[in-house]
Amino acid sequence: TFRMGSIPFLSKAAIGAQMDVDADFKTNKFILKENALSLNAIRATIDGWVAMTEKGMDMDIKLNSNEISFKEILSLIPAIYAKDFDGLKTSGEATLAAYAKGSMIGDSIMPAFDVNLNVKNAMFRYPSLPAGVDNINIAASVKNPGGSLDATTVSVNPFNLTLAGNPFSMTADVKT
């Protein structure tokens, strides 16, 4: 379970890992090779390295999900995952890719990072409901060039869907 304040972002999520790590304890550098992470039904590879320094951590880490089904993305939503998830009809594909590169020192200096989610031609429908959600297309990214978290930007363009025949479209750019 992950909460930010009083908002639950993940509830009773299943997390797994298969890790192959080369550890150099003299330099405090850990190299990640052929690793896999899972969060509910989503599987991703992770590779790169992390090094502990006197001030914090240096890193160059990449995460990639390749193509995953839209149903796997929906598995992250607690209400959907817990209730009638097996009967949920879905189609569409998604990709999730991320990286973090640079130094992390305390809470004030962060590495550069980029997280990208793309959903194409997706839909979902519960058999017991008269209509579903169709034509789901999302391109979302969270980016930071490194340094302060205040430099983080969030972009969503597009976020499109059709609910019971009614189209909905949104774009968002959030900067501090």
What are these regions (language model features)?
Residues 1-55, 62-75, 90-105, 115-175:
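Hydrophobic lipid-interacting interfaces of membrane-associated proteins
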Residues 6-7, 82-86:
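Extracellular loop and loop/strand-boundary signature of outer-membrane beta-barrel proteins
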Residues 111-112:
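Short, flexible segments with low predicted structural confidence
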